[in-house]
Amino acid sequence: MASIDFRNKINWHRRYRSPQGVKTEHEILRIFESDRGRIINSPAIRRLQQKTQVFPLERNAAVRTRLTHSMEVQQVGRYIAKEILSRLKEQNRLEEYGLDALTGPFESIVEMACLMHDIGNPPFGHFGEAAINDWFRQRLHPEDAESQPLTHDRCVVSSLRLQEGEENLNDIRRKVRQDICHFEGNAQGIRLVHTLMRMNLTWAQVGGILKYTRPAWWRGPVPDSHRYLMKKPGYYLSEEKYIARLRKELQLAPYSRFPLTWIMEAADDISYCVADLEDAVEKRIFSVEQLYHHLYHAWGHHEKDSLFELVVGNAWEKSRANTLSRSTEDQFFMYLRVNTLNKLVPYAAQRFIDNLPQIFAGTFNQALLEDASGFSRLLGLYKNVAVEHVFSHPDVEQLELQGYRVISGLLDIYQPLLSLSLNDFRELVEKERLKRFPIESRLFQKLSTRHRLAYVEVVSKLPTDSAEYPVLEYYYRCRLIQDYISGMTDLYAWDEYRRLMAVEQ
């Protein structure tokens, strides 16, 4: 078994203009402080304040947005990281694992990965993702790319339709169609950080947000050894070369994960489970008393000193004891959060340490808080109650359906840009307005300059005389539209849809 040396993982170099030479502990920490500044000051982080956590288009500032949720995840991630480092220090293993001079970067990478973990999410969360993927599937039919004979291919885009006698090109068409129809927030986060925002973060910092290791163009079953790590797309074809370089720099085997990503994932799991329930009470979906009864009955068999009694029961009793001086709601969630963290954070930290050989290798094929333990059961309890009583609430479902319609409608509106021929779209990009295409010209003008420049940069590097050119040009045109719409906030997408559908009041 290879030795564990985090100096080989916490790579402080960057893709562009990387610092050179051997660095002192302080100099390395300054490099990661620069990462923090780049991330915290990025527009993508600011936009999280108007993106959905659970309740779309929420006006109540006490209810969480993606930004406030991410800040809470950041704090829990820091807590877990410190707990891990503290335990390793007690065991005199910091130096053995190459962490004695890297505790600051270790914590910083985890914190910033937590803050960025939702950076690529589209408006309206998972329903926004579903709307994008459904819309493109209805036009590209990636499942038909496997069909024989080729005449069964229902793809409406001629350059992406399979052709007889073009097997090499057909392979690229299959990849492109599969990739475009698998938009995913985590993969979009990688694209945002590297391609769109050009943040030029350290290799280690980007490794921290590569949560899933399956390429978006993957077809067929995934290997059992990586079934959990590859359960969702983690990056797109457009970032394939960058991810290949990232793997080399971080010494990651194919489809393996960066070690600190497990901490970010655990912090997210701990944070949102309690937060979703608190937001539901704030929204008056149920009362604290009703929530307690939901949790009590969902737990099943009760024993005096069970984990449920130590965490949930304790919070309930303490909150009822202080009803005269403080809000029961505030008290209950304060104690519930504290009790949950005090149990789950040490457990997550110990799981990280106990499984460090596999985690360091990037092959640990499960989450830190998904096992047969009571701690995992407690987390599952929170999730199940939220699914049964929060996400299925009529008000929540109505807003989700509205969000799905908004994103689908925006894609319908911008569809004329995808219908233009290669030559017509190329001319529109060069001249920005064409009299013979008044609608397309106005739609093109509305696209973000950042997204248009990203399209121009990558397409200008493609050899125009290559047989692949029409296929790849259309791929990046689809990415352009997905980049623009997925980058909107909930409120902007809602307003833009109403304006362009001429239903603005």
Curated annotation (Swiss-Prot):
InterPro entries: dGTP_triP_hydro_central_sf (IPR023293), dGTPase (IPR006261), dGTPase-like (IPR050135), dNTPase_1 (IPR020779), HD/PDEase_dom (IPR003607), HD_domain (IPR006674). Residues 66-273 form the HD domain. GO terms for molecular function: dGTPase activity; magnesium ion binding. Gene3D superfamilies: Hypothetical protein af1432, putative deoxyguanosinetriphosphate triphosphohydrolase like domain. Keywords: Hydrolase, Magnesium. It is an enzyme of class 3 (hydrolase). GO terms for biological process: dGTP catabolic process. Its cofactor is Mg(2+). Pfam families: HD (PF01966). Disulfide bonds: none annotated. Its EC number is 3.1.5.1. The keyword Magnesium applies. It catalyses: dGTP + H2O = 2'-deoxyguanosine + triphosphate + H(+). dGTPase preferentially hydrolyzes dGTP over the other canonical NTPs. Belongs to the dGTPase family. Type 1 subfamily. Homotetramer. This is Deoxyguanosinetriphosphate triphosphohydrolase. The gene is dgt.
